[in-house]
């Protein structure tokens, strides 16, 4: 062979088949562009150092894994389509004298040229669009936008390009193996393969119905949010499997049922459409199922992440009714590391610490109060709340999980509540789970004790941050400290060292909520310094420690906004990729079916059907499919 012949032939093939190769090059470039952006965001120190940057690292790592999976699926789908369309062309080459190794050399040059173009174009676009995505991330995180050109990550460039080059090499190897196994006659007749009428695959049909029904049953009946996290992916996988099986087997079943309906089938409008779809559905069912799943994925990802981001402020307000919470405990340990003594810091000391910290940071205290409460988890079964150690399957144990936050009626009064005048066997209940509309039981049994529900209260003055953790979450007001101590001892006997302890904290609200996370951090540092000086006025001795927990609404807002912003960015990116994949599959399906239908519709016209009737057949097929 003349030197350069195969390269010249490869360039000619790419030019003549540009309607196939151009979308493939643009598709790989687009996937590489997104992959580079997500991969680089995961490693950009400037982004990770922003407040909430740790969420970017976590969610972008997930994005990298998803992008790798989508890239493998899409690129191999495109490769299989190109090979199917060009098998006849390769057969002609073989008949004209080119050996299979020569055809593989032509494929090598085609793969090298298209891969090089895709990688260069994808990385160039990725570098340019990375700045835009960085600015978008800063905007979503409510972070300061730093002007100037962001750095080009050489490691991300190399790894991203290498990953897609490896995919192209693997695809080339698969193509060579396919060509080596095929005979020239099979290559020439490959366009006519699959013309036999398919049969209904009953096992797939039954499994598809069961999988789809099971997925929807799980999603509709699961109420516990923690259990929903465990079963969510199970439901998604079942729905995806069911969708694929029903498209493959269910579509054939429906078309055969239409064919058996003589009044419907023996009509010049319906017969060609049903018959044509029946013969082609075997190879097109998977593509249609992919379109349905990807289109659903676009809607779910974007709508879910947008809803989370829009509801971030409401989440913060629900979990942080006040601006600042402070709790502090003094601990003393033995030389062997055993806890000898533990006590809460005096409330007066904590109050003074908050006042000093607010004064230093120019904050005006609007409300400040001492809160004491006990939060206990129970298993709700047979109208009884019991303390049980969970074991075995975590999802099953969460089925009846209930959480109750207790306060005394004296504490309730001090926090602005009305006088309840509760006896020792009476309680007041507030359903704090946003999914609950009310509480209509006359009694509540906790362990072996039954309490009369004297009244329900519309608003509980304390938020422990457990609102989203259980199906049943209540705030309960008890008569006095003795009842609270009894409930504490009750759960202590079961849970032992894992039992819940009393929470004693200061809750403060400041005039105006316009401060930011920096002010919150400085407030926490100043309060911590004051408490350490109060706890250890001389010198901190070995074995002494002070555990301080301070949380501000500003820090929580920035953390929640950062988490939801990172999720929104990932949802937008993956949603666009799924949308792009849907368009790509539709495009290649249209080309594939167009070439196949051209011959069939020419035959229809030759046997006497008018152009208008052929068009009507096409419209009928489209209507049946969608």
Annotate each PLM feature.
Residues 1-32, 197-202, 247-295, 596, ...:
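N-terminal Sec/SRP start-transfer signal
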Residues 19-26, 34-66, 81-84, 92-93, ...:
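Peri-transmembrane interface segments
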Residues 34-61, 242-245, 249-252, 296-322:
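Alpha-helical transmembrane segments
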Residues 77, 85, 178, 224, ...:
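Juxtamembrane interface at the cytosolic side of transmembrane helices
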Residues 315-580:
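Basic-flanked hydrophobic alpha-helices used for secretion and membrane insertion
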Residues 113-258:
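Hydrophobic alpha-helical segments
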Residues 62-77, 580-583:
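Long, hydrophobic alpha-helical segments
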């Amino acid at each position: 062979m003349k030197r350069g012949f195969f390269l010249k032939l490869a360039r000619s093939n790419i030019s003549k088949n540009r309607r196939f190769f151009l979308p493939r090059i643009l598709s790989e470039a687009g996937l590489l562009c997104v992959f580079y952006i997500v991969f680089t965001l995961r490693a950009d120190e400037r982004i990770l150092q922003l407040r909430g940057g740790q969420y970017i690292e976590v969610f972008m790592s997930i994005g990298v894994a998803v992008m790798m999976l989508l890239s493998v699926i899409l690129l191999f789908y495109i490769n299989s389509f190109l090979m199917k369309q060009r098998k006849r062309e390769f057969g002609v080459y073989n008949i004209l004298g080119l050996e299979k190794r020569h055809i593989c050399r032509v494929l090598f040059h085609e793969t090298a040229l298209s891969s090089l173009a895709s990688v260069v174009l994808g990385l160039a676009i990725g570098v340019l669009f990375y700045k835009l995505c960085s600015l978008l991330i800063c905007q979503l995180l409510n972070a300061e936008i730093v002007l100037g050109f962001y750095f080009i990550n050489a490691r991300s460039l190399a790894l991203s390009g290498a990953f897609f080059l490896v995919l192209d090499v693997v695809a080339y190897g698969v193509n060579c193996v396919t060509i080596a196994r095929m005979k020239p006659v099979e290559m020439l007749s490959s366009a006519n393969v699959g013309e036999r009428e398919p049969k209904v695959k009953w096992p797939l049909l039954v499994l598809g119905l069961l999988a789809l029904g099971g997925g929807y049953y799980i999603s509709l009946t699961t109420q516990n949010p923690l259990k929903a996290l465990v079963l969510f992916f199970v439901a998604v996988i079942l729905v995806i499997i069911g969708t694929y099986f029903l498209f493959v087997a269910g579509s054939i079943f429906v078309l055969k049922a239409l064919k058996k309906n003589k009044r419907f089938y023996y009509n010049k409008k319906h017969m060609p459409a049903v018959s044509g779809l029946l013969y082609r559905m075997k190879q097109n069912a998977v593509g249609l199922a992919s379109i349905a799943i990807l289109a659903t994925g676009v809607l779910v990802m974007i709508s879910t992440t947008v809803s989370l981001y829009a509801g971030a402020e409401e989440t913060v307000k629900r979990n942080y009714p006040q601006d600042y919470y402070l709790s502090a405990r003094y601990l003393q340990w033995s030389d062997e590391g055993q806890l000898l003594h533990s006590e809460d810091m005096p409330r007066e000391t904590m109050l003074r610490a908050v006042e000093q910290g607010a004064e230093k940071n120019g904050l005006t205290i609007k409300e400040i109060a001492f809160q004491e409460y006990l939060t206990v988890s129970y298993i709700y079964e047979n109208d009884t709340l019991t303390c049980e150690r969970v074991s075995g399957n975590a999802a099953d144990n969460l089925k009846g999980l209930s959480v109750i936050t207790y306060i005394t009626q004296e504490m309730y009064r001090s926090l602005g509540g009305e006088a309840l005048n509760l006896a020792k066997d009476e309680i007041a209940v507030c359903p704090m789970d946003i999914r609950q509309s009310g509480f209509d039981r006359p009694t509540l049994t906790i362990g072996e004790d039954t309490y009369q529900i004297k009244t329900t209260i519309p608003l509980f003055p304390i938020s422990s941050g457990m609102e989203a953790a259980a199906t049943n979450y209540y705030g309960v007001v008890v008569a006095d400290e003795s009842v609270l101590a009894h409930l504490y001892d009750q759960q202590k006997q079961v849970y032992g060292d894992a039992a819940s302890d009393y929470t004693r904290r200061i809750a403060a609200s400041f005039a105006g909520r316009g401060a930011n996370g920096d002010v919150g951090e400085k407030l926490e540092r100043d309060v911590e310094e004051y408490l350490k000086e109060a706890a250890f006025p001389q010198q901190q001795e070995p074995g002494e420690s002070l555990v301080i927990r301070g949380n501000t609404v500003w820090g929580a807002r920035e953390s929640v906004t950062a988490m939801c912003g990172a999720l929104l960015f990932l949802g937008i990116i993956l949603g666009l990729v799924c949308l792009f994949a849907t368009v790509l599959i539709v495009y290649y399906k249209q080309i594939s079916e167009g070439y196949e239908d051209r011959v069939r519709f020419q035959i229809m016209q030759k046997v006497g059907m008018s152009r208008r009737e052929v068009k009507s057949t096409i419209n009928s097929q489209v209507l049946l499919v969608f």
